[in-house]
């Protein structure tokens, strides 16, 4: 053994290969356990059997981080500038927006990372051990290497150990491997090479649980040296990841800062050179314009948009823990998914029955006894065929599982015991047998439990009606090769005939064919037991496997699998259409994994690369990355291996989503760009490590979430386009004022500009954030995570098209008001040198209102990228409709009520003014609809925004 401050690190590779006696010797203990003194000495040496917590960020720092990211800092600075520029009310308003946004973000993401605490909750408090030759109860944290543990059904395993005594000991290792089938444990030495620790039949692991039987275990590892501890260490040491959206918002902040400062400097110079104001006055004016060019409403709009997306996703069975994770889903390029329970139903189902005379198909999936046994186009009952009846009765009787009916209407059947045995009961019921009635007619009198060495189990039953002249019968089920080897006879068409090489070959060919498809196969045979049979013990308790499991009569094969979820194939196809690769990483065997992967469309080629955990250990990162470019399936993976796959995909530039439900998945879940945990079967550890939880454990829900994530990013671009385009009509009138040397009075005041940024723009922008996904959102390739939010296309559309339209409308409205009052070309404009001139006030009010009314058309235009807005329904977005009503009501409010007229430099407008304003939205809408139609025709896109060739393929 090696000393360690984190526990003990016994050479586990050697322990499974030792006999029980040698295990005691190697670990310095005995069947009587450690003495109290030795246990205390070892605890001093190895420490407590606890999962240590890593350093965690304090809640105060987490809270403050919501106020110190780049966009928040920009708003703090904007508030300071507003105070310096003599606008304290504005400064307070900007700071208040920042505070509210930060508090809201913290509240949304207030669930701290509790992965380590969740691990601790999975461990028992007290355990039974043998010390000083006596059974004792001790605290689990006081266990040391060499302690002899006593495990019984229902116990949680408190440390890693080597089994030294087993009485049908079965352990649920799903928390570590992800596979739900109980694993039978043996005390025998393992000589087979190329097995991972999790595959060792004589090792048990901390955090797993005993599902059946009992046994004794010598502790080999404690604390952080256990498999559990290693997973905790991997999880703790993971660096906090930054989402693509966080990176893009930081970059956008830099762009906005540079733009605002450049505009401030430009306006300062223009004011000095053309208007000839003093330096101080020009500086204050420039500061006001800097504040005006910072989109104060962008950050809260992004936050609220993400929060609304979280609510929408929860209705589609996806609970998102982190707001920024919503958008990251949209750039996902690879989904690494578990198999059991995510792609499959996690309910073993018999789908074929085979006898030498007939092959039957079994319909229905899951544990619900709904379905039929069919052959040659018709349904069969057990009563119709004696061979079929014996096959089904033998499978049902040679089983310890129990089916529990749903507790409520519409509920699911549940299983007590081995799921593989449970599906045998279901297949019997589908053929009209009642397992309870069968058991009443043939009560069990003896069981010879399954052993991994024998690969079979047998049960002996008393008969009401003789079988082959005997009043007792033994049913044996197990690995087909073993059962066939022990069979000397076969039932064919109701007759018992001798086993021949030809029949043996026929049986094994059928088995091999099913196994090649990744199906699990169990053989069923029986042996009549005559009371006067020579060589059979007189007492039932003296029966041994050697006495019973010989001269068997082979009956048939029961073929089963955990079937794919019915909606998964369509979801995988949708991923392919969206340019997203799906890679299966499972703890199951390679053949089974490939079979399921092929059925649901994850792999299409004839020879996909299949990596086992042991093969992956021998593969370099360079070789792995080459393999990851093609079709690949990973089977029998350990936690650190799954993590390695994720890390290599990320190194290749992929944005990776990972699904998982067990403790073993937590490192990969935390490392992934998006960790997706299962809500039903998932452990607390997996849920805490993940960014998103699926409440229905369904892969299809991930695809819905990706669609929503793509829509969120598209919507952020839409409302960013909407918010930023108003900067042009805010800037151009001011530029006209400056370039005219003051001959054209300032069409918009700073407070009017802030009215647009923090008032009229906010709610319509928020409405754009709730826009449903466009029809072609899953027909596009994944977004490049390095692509900037504010790219050239957005800037061109915002500043060179929408912005110019708004600026033209604003200036036109300003001039319209001047002309209405009698101004003409060559005359001095109303308001020059007279800020309170009534005509000038009316003109600035019109300029402000024109921007607002133009934005009504713009918000409709922004709802779709290329599709006609009429294809989605002009008024179908209620949030946008409410936003439009709000901004119109606000502008009326600011112009009608005297207390606000002085602050915002406004006045009431007349019917002619409103007649001019209401023409603006339809004009803007018509111009953009025309532009979109021209672009669609050029790109071969229909009115709904879908490429015409793609539409034809889908049809």
Q: Where do the PLM segments sit?
A:
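Conserved cytosolic headpiece of P-type ATPases
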Residues: 1-782, 786-790, 804, 848, ...
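Membrane-water interface at loop-to-transmembrane-helix junctions
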Residues: 786-805, 833-846
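Alpha-helical transmembrane segments of multi-pass integral membrane proteins
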Residues: 798-813, 853
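Membrane-interfacial helical/loop segments at transmembrane boundaries in membrane proteins
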Residues: 821-838, 908
């Amino acid at each position: 053994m090696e000393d360690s401050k984190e526990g003990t690190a016994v050479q586990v590779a050697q322990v499974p290969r030792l006999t029980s006696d040698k295990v005691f010797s190697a670990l310095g203990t005995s069947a009587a356990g450690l003495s109290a003194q030795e246990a205390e000495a070892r605890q001093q040496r190895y420490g407590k059997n606890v999962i240590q917590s890593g350093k965690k960020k304090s809640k105060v720092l987490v809270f403050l981080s919501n106020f110190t990211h780049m966009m928040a800092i920009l708003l703090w600075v904007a508030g300071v500038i507003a105070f310096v520029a003599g606008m304290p009310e504005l400064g307070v308003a900007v700071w208040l927006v920042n505070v509210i946004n930060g508090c809201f973000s913290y509240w949304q993401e207030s669930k701290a990372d509790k992965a380590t605490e969740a691990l601790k909750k999975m461990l028992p408090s007290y355990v039974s051990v043998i010390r000083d030759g006596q059974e004792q109860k001790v605290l689990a944290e006081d266990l040391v290497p060499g302690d002899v543990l006593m495990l019984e059904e229902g116990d949680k395993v408190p440390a890693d150990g080597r089994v030294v005594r087993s009485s049908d000991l079965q352990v649920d290792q799903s928390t570590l491997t992800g596979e739900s089938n109980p694993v039978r444990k043996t005390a025998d030495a393992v000589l087979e090479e190329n097995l991972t620790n999790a595959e060792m039949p004589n090792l048990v692991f901390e955090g797993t649980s005993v599902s059946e039987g009992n046994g004794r275990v010598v502790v080999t590892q404690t604390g952080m040296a256990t498999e559990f501890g290693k997973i905790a260490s991997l999880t703790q040491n993971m660096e906090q990841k930054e989402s693509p959206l966080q990176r893009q918002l930081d970059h956008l902040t830099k762009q906005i800062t540079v733009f605002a400062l450049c505009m401030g400097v430009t306006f300062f110079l223009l004011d000095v050179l053309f208007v000839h104001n003093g330096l101080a006055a020009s500086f204050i004016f420039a500061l006001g314009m800097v504040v005006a060019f910072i989109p104060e409403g962008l950050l809260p709009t992004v936050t609220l948009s993400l929060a609304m997306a979280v609510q929408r996703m929860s209705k589609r069975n996806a609970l998102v823990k982190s707001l920024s994770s919503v958008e990251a889903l949209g750039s996902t390029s690879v989904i690494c998914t578990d198999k059991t329970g995510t792609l499959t139903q996690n309910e073993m189902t018999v789908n074929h029955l085979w006898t030498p005379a007939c092959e039957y198909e079994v319909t229905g999936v899951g544990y619900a006894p709904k379905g039929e046994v069919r052959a040659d186009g018709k349904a069969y009952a057990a009563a119709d065929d004696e061979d079929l009846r014996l096959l089904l009765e033998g499978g049902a009787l040679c089983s310890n599982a129990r089916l529990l009916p749903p507790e409520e209407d519409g509920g699911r059947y549940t299983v007590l015991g081995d799921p593989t045995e449970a599906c045998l009961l279901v297949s019997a019921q589908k053929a009209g047998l009642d397992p309870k009635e069968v058991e009443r007619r043939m009560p069990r009198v003896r069981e010879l439990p399954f052993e991994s060495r024998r690969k079979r189990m047998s049960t002996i039953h008393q008969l009401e009606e003789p079988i082959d002249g005997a009043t007792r019968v033994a049913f044996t089920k197990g690995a087909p090769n073993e059962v066939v080897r022990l069979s000397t006879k076969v039932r064919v068409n109701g007759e018992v005939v001798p086993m021949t090489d030809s029949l043996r070959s026929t049986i094994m060919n059928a088995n091999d064919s099913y196994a090649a498809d990744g199906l699990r196969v169990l053989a069923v045979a029986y042996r009549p037991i005559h009371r006067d049979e020579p060589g059979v013990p007189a007492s039932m308790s003296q029966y041994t496997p050697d006495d019973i499991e010989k001269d068997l009569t082979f009956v048939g094969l029961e073929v089963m699998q955990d079937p794919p979820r019915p909606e998964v194939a369509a979801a995988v196809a949708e991923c392919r259409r969206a340019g997203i690769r799906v890679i299966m990483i499972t703890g199951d065997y390679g053949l089974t994994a490939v079979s399921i992967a092929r059925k649901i469309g994850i792999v299409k080629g004839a020879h996909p690369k299949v990596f086992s955990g042991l093969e992956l250990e021998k593969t370099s990162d360079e070789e792995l990355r080459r393999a990851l470019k093609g079709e690949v399936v990973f089977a029998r993976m350990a936690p650190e291996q799954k993590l390695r796959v994720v890390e290599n995909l990320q190194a290749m530039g992929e944005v990776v989503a990972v699904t998982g439900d067990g403790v073993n998945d937590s490192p990969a879940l935390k490392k992934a760009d998006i960790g997706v945990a299962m809500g039903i079967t998932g452990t607390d550890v997996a849920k805490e490590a993940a960014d998103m939880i699926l409440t229905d454990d369904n892969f299809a829900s991930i695809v819905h979430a990706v669609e929503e994530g793509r829509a969120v990013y598209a919507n952020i671009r839409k409302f960013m386009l909407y918010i930023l385009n108003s900067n042009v009509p805010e800037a151009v009138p001011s530029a006209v004022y400056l370039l005219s040397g003051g001959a054209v009075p300032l069409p918009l005041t700073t407070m009017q500009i802030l009215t647009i940024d923090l008032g009229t723009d906010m709610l319509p922008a928020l409405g754009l954030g709730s826009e449903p996904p466009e029809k072609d959102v899953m027909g596009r390739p994944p977004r490049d995570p390095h692509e900037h939010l504010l790219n050239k296309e957005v800037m061109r559309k915002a500043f060179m098209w929408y912005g110019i339209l708004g600026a033209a409308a604003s200036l036109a409205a300003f001039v319209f008001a001047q002309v209405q009052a009698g101004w003409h070309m060559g005359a001095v404009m109303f308001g020059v040198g007279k800020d309170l001139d009534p005509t000038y006030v009316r003109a600035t009010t019109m300029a402000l209102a024109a921007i607002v009314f133009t934005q009504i058309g713009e918000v409709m235009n922004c709802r779709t990228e290329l599709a006609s807005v009429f294809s989605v329904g002009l008024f179908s977005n209620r949030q946008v409709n409410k936003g439009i009503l709000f901004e119109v009501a606000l502008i009326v409010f600011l112009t009608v009520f005297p207390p606000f007229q002085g602050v915002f430099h406004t006045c009431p407008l007349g019917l002619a003014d409103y007649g001019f304003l209401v023409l603006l939205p339809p004009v803007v809408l018509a111009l953009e609809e025309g532009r979109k139609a021209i672009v669609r025709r050029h790109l071969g896109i229909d009115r709904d925004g879908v490429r015409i060739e793609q539409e034809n393929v889908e049809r």
